[in-house]
């Protein structure tokens, strides 16, 4: 999987979604922020607490956090271990497109997490293996120049959401 340099921006440059796999030896500083898109944070390694709407989550490798499009959040990265994660940003337009296509509201998991005030998902081993495979496939398709690679990236993303 291709690892990208950390980009501190909190603005999407793509219309529907963005997929970033980032790795840092030195922890970046990220202030509290919010943005008008949804975020899936897939923690791979490091020493991290993540704060969402005032609630702190002590993360373990493989943990997933769901951040809604208005949640105030930030990672608290402590030094000592490399910090690796996958971040997926999803615009309202992406979910609108999926709803027109499937008739289903894929924002429901984000809404439910916010209502329960618990945004942490800790997948079982089998699910974790499959989610990592899908991230690998999304990364490969994202950087591919082959015909249909953008559609394939989106298909893997939808499978990840399901």
Predicted regions and their residues:
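Generic protein-terminus/edge-of-domain signal
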Residues: 1-64, 71, 79, 103-119
């Amino acid at each position: 999987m291709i690892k990208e340099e950390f980009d501190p921006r909190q603005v999407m440059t793509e219309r529907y979604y963005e997929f970033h796999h980032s790795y840092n030896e030195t922890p970046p500083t990220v202030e509290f922020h919010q943005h008008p898109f949804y975020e899936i944070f897939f923690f791979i390694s490091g020493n991290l607490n993540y704060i969402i709407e005032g609630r702190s989550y002590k993360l373990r490798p493989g943990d997933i956090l769901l951040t809604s499009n208005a949640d105030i959040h930030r990672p608290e990265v402590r030094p000592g271990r490399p910090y690796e994660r996958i971040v997926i940003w999803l615009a309202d337009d992406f979910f609108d497109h999926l709803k027109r296509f499937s008739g289903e509201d894929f924002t429901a998991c984000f809404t439910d997490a916010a209502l329960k005030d618990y945004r942490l998902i800790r997948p079982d081993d089998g699910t974790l293996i499959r989610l990592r495979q899908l991230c690998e496939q999304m990364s490969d398709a994202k950087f591919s120049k082959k015909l249909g690679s953008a559609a394939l990236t989106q298909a893997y993303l939808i499978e990840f959401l399901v």
